[in-house]
Amino acid sequence: LSMPVLAAPMTGVLYNMGGKLSEDAFIRMIIEGAAAAGTIGMCGDGADPAMYASGVDAIMAQGGCGIPIVKPRAQEAVKEMLARADAAGAAAVGVDVDGAGLLVMALKGQPVSPKSFAELAELVGATKLPFIVKGVMTPDEAVIAFDAGAAAIVVSNHGGRVLDHAPGAAEVLPEIASAVRGRGVILADGGVRTGADVLKYLALGADAVLIGRPLVVGAFGGGAEGVATLLQKLKSELTSAMLLTGTASVRAVSPRILRPAAVR
């Protein structure tokens, strides 16, 4: 990757974004734009099965440069979707376990439910691709994910849309990172708007971050080029922030660059 930033999985263009673009056009812009910027875009899953299909098709068209994220559906349904990601040559695949709280899925006849350790392990074993567990918010959840064989986790509260009063990812990230550092890749999302925000997340323990809503603006305003431009802007801002904090590389980011709340 050219930067520690990936495009987050997003679906629901019609009911979340005004419907000015089709689901297919939107996700192609995200996947193509991310690839043009030297990184990877994720695609999501939703109440309409066509949403996932659009994402997988976009990833296949981009030579596999993308990561599908599946809702926590029934085991056999998830396995079938993992197989489609595998056939598309995807870089990795995952399940957003906090999607179990999305009532719209059940209302649309697409039931979802929490996943146990055994169920996660079964899904990890059902694909040859690196497996990502998205929606981790506590250290014990992170341990379970890695014990089940996940290659990566995403510390995320689903954009604040599944549980009122849940803490932000940045609040819980340090404790989670401390519990599982070295066991796999730690990703995080939520509120990233500038390159300085990216650096903060890295200092809190993330290996890379996901960015979502701003890329909607990029896609609607400038298509794939708009997505790439926004990501490149983040990279430039991150580079500047690293220079100004004496950070030589993303692997050398230190918590020392953060100012403790107690001294503000």
What is each residue range found by the language model?
Residues Q110-A142, D147-A148, A169-R181, V185, ...:
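Active-site/ligand-binding-proximal alpha/beta "capping" segment
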Residues A142-A145, A150, Y201, A206:
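Small-residue (primarily alanine) positions within well-ordered alpha-helices
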Residues E23, A166-A169:
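Short, conserved glycine- and acidic-residue-centered signature motifs
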Residues G168-R264:
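Alpha/beta catalytic cores of nucleotide-metabolism and tRNA/nucleoside-modifying enzymes
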Residues L1-V143, D147, G159-V162:
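Active-site entrance/lid segments in N-terminal catalytic domains of soluble metabolic enzymes
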